[in-house]
Design a protein with these regions (language model features):
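N-terminal flexible segment immediately upstream of the FAD-binding catalytic core
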Residues: 1-62, 79-109, 262-274, 323-347, ...
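N-terminal accessory segments
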Residues: 1-37, 67-69, 308-324, 414-419, ...
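C-terminal substrate-recognition/cap domain of FAD-linked oxidoreductases
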Residues: 25-33, 215, 219, 230-233, ...
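Short, ordered loop/turn segments at secondary-structure junctions
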Residues: 75-78, 98, 138, 260, ...
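FAD-binding subdomain of flavoenzyme oxidoreductases
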Residues: 100-254, 458
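Activity-critical C-terminal alpha-helical subdomain
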Residues: 179, 430-464
Length: 464
């Protein structure tokens, strides 16, 4: 049979075993399956299959493996690295129908959910039980659990709770040949052999498809304190971070730093935003803590910032007095979503490195880009407490975007940093992975891929 006949037979088989409504082809494949949020290289898949259970996923992958049919796994399509965007000849396996919280155990503080469950649904289920699922992203209403696990998502509270890798106790995944690996562990301690779930966390669907997961929950804490601080040096940023950690400890839940390039640009271009400071400063730190004793936590918070102000570590600070203040501070930090259209065309980077290397790295970026491209707008902010910087760089010329990416990723490699801190590699960063991984590491990744997916059908052309 030729390729068309093989595909026709495959879709007929899947329709018979899963139901006709589980297989979309031809005009029934909508544009929403053509591209993720990156917007790069949109292409409709040749068909879309919509499983409702782990057994359905196993059936799909078994038949696709036997037919040699490439598969792209899709969730909420909120990724920024092109990992869920179809490539030529691929069938899309969409997890959107595998949605729902299966159980919540208050005693163990765990929640079990299907991989197509939106993050916000998980957060709300935890909140209704008086608990907290701490991972939070701007795309919370759309992004799905499976994609979060596949990319090892981070968010604003990594400094306290870690990446999602730290929040997953167990999971269920389906290998490329349809084998189901059920490792639905619910314990914090389990050293019974290899921790197989790690094969599927952060590997972007290249080694298997996550279908269910057991997540850690935490107590909700009433004592939230938020402040926006102004600083005149990166040394002050580091000193303030260490002071907060020393005096407030594990209550620190967010430490977001904005360089003036970003802060001033957002204030200027988003009409609803206002700076709480009378003048501009080189750097700004948004700090948030969450504790158990509202009055005591607020006292320690104010005392720590007061000492930093008196010693000259910070030049000014505004402590939130209401939820409206909290929202206005975070609106500045999250203002990037409001200004990307004004920046177009731009290079977006999500990198990480040792905190001490950040000033030198940024100086190198500015110097080398200016020498090569002339005037450059470089907006910088990030989760400095967990080594992560986000850069949005533009010259106003589309032709400069790819050369800028290559130049900055090379500098990242020179500082032994990572070309992807939290957004994944996908298809768009694949060519830059060698800046952050040795040839031996890359070969080991390829060996794992060949072992678990010998026919190479799962998310090919991504990561490695």
């Amino acid at each position: 049979m030729d390729g068309a006949d093989v595909m026709s037979e495959l879709l007929t088989t899947l329709s018979r075993e899963l139901g006709e409504d589980a297989v979309l082809g031809g005009p029934d494949v909508s544009d929403k399956y053509a591209v993720d949020v990156s917007g790069e290289n949109p292409l409709k898949p040749i068909a879309v299959v919509l499983p409702r259970s782990t057994a359905d996923v196993a059936t799909i992958l078994r038949h696709c493996s036997e037919a040699g049919q490439p598969v792209v796994v899709q969730g909420g399509l909120t990724g920024l690295s092109g990992g869920a965007t179809p490539q030529p000849g691929e069938l899309a396996l969409s997890l959107e129908r595998m949605s729902g919280v299966e159980s919540l155990d208050r005693a163990s503080m765990t929640l079990t959910a299907l991989s197509g469950t939106p993050l916000q649904v998980i957060q709300e289920a935890a909140e209704e039980a008086g608990l907290l699922f701490p991972l939070d992203l701007g795309a919370r209403g759309t992004c799905q659990l499976g994609g979060l696990i596949a990319t090892n998502a981070g968010g604003n509270q990594v400094i306290r709770f870690g990446m999602i890798r730290n929040l997953v106790l167990g999971l269920e995944a389906v290998l490329a040949d349809g084998t189901v690996i059920s490792s639905m562990n619910r314990m914090l301690k389990n050293n019974a052999g290899y921790d197989l779930k790690q094969l599927f966390i952060g590997t972007e669907g290249t080694l298997g498809v996550v279908t269910r997961a057991v997540l850690r929950l935490f107590p909700r804490l009433p004592g939230k304190c938020t402040a926006l601080c102004a600083l005149d040096s990166f040394a002050g940023v580091v000193e303030l971070l260490r002071a907060v950690q020393a005096n407030i400890g594990s209550s620190l839940s967010a430490y977001e730093v904005m360089w003036a390039s970003y802060f001033d640009y957002v204030i200027e271009h988003v009409g609803t935003l206002r700076s709480p400071f009378e003048r501009t400063y080189p750097l700004y730190a948004l700090i948030e803590t969450e504790g158990t004793d509202t009055a005591h936590d607020a006292e320690r918070f104010e005392s720590t910032l007061g000492s930093a102000l008196e010693s000259g570590v910070i030049q000014d600070a505004v402590i939130a007095q209401s939820q409206q203040d909290v929202q206005s501070f975070w609106a500045i930090r999250d203002g990037i979503a409001e200004i990307t259209s004004a920046l177009m065309p731009y290079a977006s980077l999500d990198v990480s490195m040792a905190v001490a290397d950040m000033p030198g790295f940024l100086d190198q970026v500015d110097e080398k880009l200016a020498a090569r491209f002339g005037p450059v707008t470089n907006l910088v902010f990030g989760h400095v407490g967990d080594n992560n910087l986000h850069l949005f760089i533009t010259t106003g010329r589309e032709a400069d975007v790819d050369p800028i990416l290559d130049a900055v990723y090379k500098i990242t490699g020179d500082y032994q940093g990572s070309v992807s801190a939290e957004h994944g590699i996908g298809a768009l960063k694949r060519e830059y992975l060698h800046y952050s991984r040795s040839s031996e590491e890359l070969e080991l990744m390829r060996r794992l891929k060949r072992t678990l997916d010998p026919n190479g059908i799962l998310n090919g052309g991504r990561v490695i």
